[in-house]
Design a protein with these regions (language model features):
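Conserved Lys-Pro-Asp/Glu-containing loop-to-beta segment of HAD-superfamily phosphomonoesterases
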Residues: 9-12, 57
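N-terminal G-site helix/loop of the GST-like fold
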Residues: 12-29
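A short, flexible N-terminal coil/short beta segment enriched in small residues
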Residues: 1-10
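TOPRIM fold recognition
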Residues: 4, 23, 29, 37-91
Length: 91
């Protein structure tokens, strides 16, 4: 299967998210490490730099995902953020 090429970097929450997404998307994928992004100045600087031309934020629809999106919105200009949402699935 050919991977979908995406030019903008994608921000996801964890390693599993990155691993899964890497299976079908050809893009730069950065993990937040969950809430560790709040204190990781190096990762924040990387995300700021990558976000200069735009960035895709793909987080869970739960409370944690919302907090991470809100935090990223505070460090990247809002016109550079493309939020994608993973819906909650109830079984």
């Amino acid at each position: 299967m050919e991977k979908i090429k995406i030019s903008l970097p994608i921000i996801v929450e964890g390693r599993y998210d990155k691993s899964t997404l890497s299976g079908f998307v050809d893009a730069t994928i950065i993990t937040t490490g969950g809430f560790s992004i709040f204190n990781n100045k190096e990762k924040q600087a990387l995300i700021r730099r990558l976000g200069e031309d735009g960035i895709i934020v793909l987080t869970d629809s739960d409370g944690g995902g919302k907090q991470i999106r809100k935090f990223l919105a505070a460090i990247i200009p809002s016109d550079k953020i493309h939020n994608l949402y993973i819906p909650c699935l109830l079984f």
